[in-house]
Amino acid sequence: MTIHIYNTLTRQKEEFVPLEENKVKMYVCGPTVYNYIHIGNARPPMVFDTVRRYLEYKGYDVQYVSNFTDVDDKLIKAANELGEDVPTIADRFVEAYFEDVTALGCKHATVHPRVTENMDIIIEFIQELVNKGYAYESEGDVYFKTKEFEGYGKLSHQPIADLRHGARIEVGEKKQDPLDFALWKAAKEGEIFWESPWGQGRPGWHIECSAMARKYLGDTIDIHAGGQDLAFPHHENEIAQSEALTGKTFARYWMHNGYININNEKMSKSLGNFILVHDIIKQYDPQLIRFFMLSVHYRHPINFSEELLQSTNNGLERIKTAYGNLKHRMESSTDLTDHNEKWLVEIEKFQTAFEEAMNDDFNTANAITELYNVANYANQYLLEEHTSKVVIEAYVKQLETLFDILGLELTQEELLDEEIEELIQKRIEARKNRDFALSDQIRDDLKGRNIILEDTAQGTRWKRG
């Protein structure tokens, strides 16, 4: 089965064929570290960490690079407001970023380059563009000359005339064309700066990723990814800079994830409806946040609400409970061989369906449907009077493998005594109402979490297994 990726550049799904056999070069635009990340910022790390995990599962050696922009207008503004220097603020929020995304199940990239640690290669990149006639200096600033790059607009699929019509020259800018963008910005009084051939200053945003991608991954990379909002102008400008310099294709597959809405309204800081990751992971299990995010195809928008989160939690707990029940049954299962084939064939079908979903542009939504199917069939198998260790182990291994691909864990938080008593009372009410299906479900769910019930004449007793 081959992997197909929706390529923003061509607007169609294409078979994934890396430049080098069994190796993938992948660059994901990272955050500007001037504040804590919100859940919209967290979607790309979770999505593309999952892409990376699946590629590794399929046997690829993935070189995964994700940068930190640690000098920028927003950082300078934050430094001025807080009375701190830029490096101090950047260091603080790099650490906070790692805490947040690690909690959300994301592995560290192969390399996390920082702009301030790569200033020499950024300046060198700009100088080469100037030498080739693709950039020009203007009163200490350096701009990219967009009219010199023939393919400008090919990622956003907009004619250059339309792009120019919507562009403007800001006050203080000395550029030749409204579409030209800054590669180097002359330092203003009191700002952090670096020495360069054009005087003291700092790099523009777009050039940073081009230079660092080239340093760590080479002239051409396999996958370049980020949020949908980065397609234009950031990624468009990256293509222009990189391909103008090297004359080679910069990235072969462009992937962009969709936006996040809060209660059906687009999330934005201006509306004040954003949710910080470090706040929400105190309220909800970070694994639930990740599972929720992956329950929607990465290119589609997500509507984030507490009601939807709770509904998703019910589904996640159902899978975890099935896993717990399987583990609990392991000890009492035997070496039966009768009827194993029927169940093992079904398990293989689920594996195939899961991989087909992931091969289809990393469709985690459909892949998660297969997790529910595995859990449902496992529960059916557990109703058998006698169960086989071979089948139980196959179900357990499958759930563990599929969860690992999605960056998820199967552990459940231990129930508090009062939570157990509450569930027992709910079960008693269900039995009074002759709702035996609910009664059995509660009993089985508790058993899956190592809580054993014993019905006696004096009432229901329980113990931890």
UniProtKB/Swiss-Prot annotation:
Q: Where in the cell is it found?
A: Cytoplasm
Motif 'KMSKS' region, per the record, lies over: 266-270
Q: Cytoplasm as a keyword? A: yes
Q: What Gene Ontology cellular component terms go with this record?
A: cytosol
Q: Identify the Pfam families for this entry.
A: DALR_2, tRNA-synt_1e
Q: Which GO terms describe its biological process?
A: cysteinyl-tRNA aminoacylation
Does the record's keyword annotation contain ATP-binding?
yes
Phosphoserine carried by residues: S270
Q: What does this protein's record comment on cofactor binding? A: Binds 1 zinc ion per subunit.
UniProt entry keywords in alphabetical sequence: Aminoacyl-tRNA synthetase, ATP-binding, Cytoplasm, Ligase, Metal-binding, Nucleotide-binding, Phosphoprotein, Protein biosynthesis, Zinc
Cofactor or coenzyme needed: Zn(2+)
Protein family membership: Belongs to the class-I aminoacyl-tRNA synthetase family.
Tell me which PANTHER family the record gives. Answer: CYSTEINE--TRNA LIGASE, CYTOPLASMIC, CYSTEINYL-TRNA SYNTHETASE
Q: Specify the protein name.
A: Cysteine--tRNA ligase
The upper taxonomy is: Bacteria, Bacillati, Bacillota, Bacilli, Bacillales
Gene name tied to this protein = cysS
